[in-house]
A protein has these predicted regions:
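Short loop/beta submotifs within extracellular cysteine-rich repeat domains
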Residues: 3-4, 14-16, 26-29, 61-64, ...
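Glycine-rich beta-strand-turn "strand-cap" elements at beta-sheet edges
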Residues: 33-50, 78-108
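Short amphipathic alpha-helical segments
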Residues: 14-40, 72
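Short, flexible helix/strand-to-coil boundary loops that buttress conserved ligand/catalytic motifs
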Residues: 22, 68, 81
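Short, well-ordered beta-strand segments in beta-rich or mixed alpha/beta enzyme
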Residues: 3-9, 39-74, 95-99
């Protein structure tokens, strides 16, 4: 397994809107595509309370490219994204890191 850590750096005041989109739209679409989230986090103490962190689990990079690529071009997703960003983008930038577990990690 590999893990993808994504950090969405939200525009000021837009984190609640991003959380709502994940909860009501994105997760349902991911389930349809077979995308497996490990967890979601917001910053309690740290540099930015405007960030959403989440992690996805993949069998390999090929699965990631196939499933996330299909999701990213899905007409239902594109419509929902446009509708939820009518008042401007929810994020200012997105950080993305692919992680490989160490031999001593509980998550393999």
């Amino acid at each position: 397994m590999i893990y993808e850590l994504r950090i969405y750096h939200c525009a000021p005041g837009r984190l609640p809107d991003l959380n709502k989109r994940f909860e009501t739209i994105t997760l349902k679409l991911w389930e349809r595509f077979g995308i497996r989230p490990v967890g979601f986090w917001t910053v309690m103490i740290g540099e930015s309370n405007h960030d959403l962190y989440y992690m996805l689990e993949w069998k390999d990079l090929a699965e990631r490219e196939s499933l996330f690529g299909a999701f990213a071009t899905d007409p239902e997703w594109l419509k929902a994204r446009a509708e939820t960003e009518q008042n401007g983008p929810l994020t200012t930038s997105i950080s993305n890191t692919m992680l490989s577990p160490t031999s001593y990690s509980k998550m393999q």
